[in-house]
Amino acid sequence: MGKLNDREIASLLSEPIISFITTLNRDGSPHTSPVWHMAQDGKVIVATGSSTVKSNNIAKDPRVSLVAAAGRSPQPWVQINGKAVVSKPE
């Protein structure tokens, strides 16, 4: 599958699929977890508990990578690298 355009990325991120988020452990090694995501206002939101490994890792080092891939063929996927913020629900 070739590179996705912005519309295809938005469509993929709106699907109810499991994504994988990678955070960095204290020693710099990767920690990858399956998560549900929601795309909203140009951001990707992931729900997790405040005491999870990923929350603790993000508090120490906000760099993350999220991969969302649909379970069909050809398999569209997107990888988003950036910085995460841990926040409490409003």
Where are the predicted features?
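Extreme N-terminal tail/first-helix region
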Residues: 1-18, 74
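Short, acidic, Ser/Thr-enriched surface-loop or helix-capping motifs
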Residues: 25-27, 39
